[in-house]
Amino acid sequence: MPQDKLHITALEVTHSKTAPEIQELVDGVKDKIPAMTDYTYNHRARLVKPLIGYDASALALSFVPAAGEGLHSGRTPEDDEFTYHHLRRDLFSLSRDAGLKVESRYVVPSSHLTIGRFIYSKDLENENGSPDPDKMKALIEKIEEINGWLAKEFWPEHNDGTIPEGGEFNVGQEKGLHCGTGSLWYGGGDALHLGKGY
């Protein structure tokens, strides 16, 4: 996945609709979008403990909501009481209150960056085109090796209770939330509004 396409989807409002259907939804809530994209300016969710996860179609860098661990100066345990799950809940409510019917494909409250897709199976097949257990085992072992490194490098348990630089993600910090429309898979689509960072 190209770095400029990496993203975490905080809320998918809808999918599999025509461009005119999407435009009608956008037109109905355009004036409400800045409040949604700026929401993280005053509602700051922190994600920690990066790990690589995978399923049959992709690899992702996943995080969990912070719970007071590895606090940096100026941040208190109370600040972590507002979590990524609360952010998703509130964005859902803001969307619904704006008149949108939220029809997400994925409702599991995951916080992940898709970093790679399994597009072709040939890399994990033998010379006959069948799945190769040894290649699969090697892939899983490499993922487990990377996860061991991530935990050792970035988790507070392995760093005297601190989180080294690069070990946490503060949602909306650099740019605020991005609201997009169109073919959004893999970070594509058109930008409607970019929230303010903090």
Protein language model features and the residues they cover:
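Histidine-dependent nucleotide/RNA phosphoesterase domain, centered on the 2H-phosphoesterase fold
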Residues: 1-198
